[in-house]
């Protein structure tokens, strides 16, 4: 049994296809969705959503949002999203390294605003790198 999965950002539909399984980065941890899942509405963290079609997994970097599950339909509304197969791995690695350095610099600055912004940029860079297939070492 399959379900319909849609990932919608303000500027585009990132994914609209059937799938057998979905793993979402919810605010309470990873959340697995299979066919006939109970109705659900959940907030999503910045992270990687994984969609399984037959034996293939597709990774999608999500930048926060919400997911609704109902009647074998999973609708994900996000601020921004990118399929992992469209992200350049080398660029993602470089951005992740830069984000790590920015977190360290912000911690030394003592500015709460700088720390929050650096942490958000770090989460985005980590999600993009993971979706692109990179190994994240912290």
From Swiss-Prot:
Record-linked InterPro entries: ATP_synth_F1_dsu/esu (IPR001469), ATP_synth_F1_dsu/esu_N (IPR020546), ATP_synth_F1_esu_C (IPR020547), ATPsynth_dsu/esu_N (IPR036771)
Compartment(s): Cellular thylakoid membrane
Keyword check for Thylakoid: yes
MF terms (GO), sorted A to Z: ATP binding; proton-transporting ATP synthase activity, rotational mechanism
Main location: membrane
Gene Ontology CC, one term: proton-transporting ATP synthase complex
Pfam families documented for this protein: ATP-synt_DE (PF00401), ATP-synt_DE_N (PF02823)
The entry's keywords: ATP synthesis, CF(1), Hydrogen ion transport, Ion transport, Membrane, Thylakoid, Transport
Topology in the lipid bilayer: Peripheral membrane protein
NCBIfam families: ATP_synt_epsi, PRK13442.1
Quaternary structure and partners: F-type ATPases have 2 components, CF(1) - the catalytic core - and CF(0) - the membrane proton channel. CF(1) has five subunits: alpha(3), beta(3), gamma(1), delta(1), epsilon(1). CF(0) has three main subunits: a, b and c.
Family: Belongs to the ATPase epsilon chain family.
Function: Produces ATP from ADP in the presence of a proton gradient across the membrane.
Protein name according to UniProt: ATP synthase epsilon chain
Record lineage: Bacteria, Bacillati, Cyanobacteriota, Cyanophyceae, Synechococcales
């Amino acid at each position: 049994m399959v379900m319909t999965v849609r990932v919608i950002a303000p500027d585009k539909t990132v994914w609209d296809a059937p799938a057998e399984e979905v793993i979402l980065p919810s605010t309470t941890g990873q959340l697995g969705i299979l066919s006939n899942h109970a109705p659900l509405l959940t907030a999503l963290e910045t992270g990687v959503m994984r969609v399984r079609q037959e034996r293939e997994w597709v990774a999608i970097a999500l930048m926060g949002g919400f997911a609704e599950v109902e009647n074998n339909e999973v609708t994900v509304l996000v601020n921004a999203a990118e399929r992992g197969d469209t992200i350049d791995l080398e660029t993602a690695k470089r951005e992740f390294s830069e984000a790590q350095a920015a977190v360290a610099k912000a911690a030394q600055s003592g500015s709460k605003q700088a720390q929050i912004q650096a942490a958000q940029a770090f989460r985005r860079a980590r999600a993009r790198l993971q979706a692109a297939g990179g190994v994240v070492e912290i």
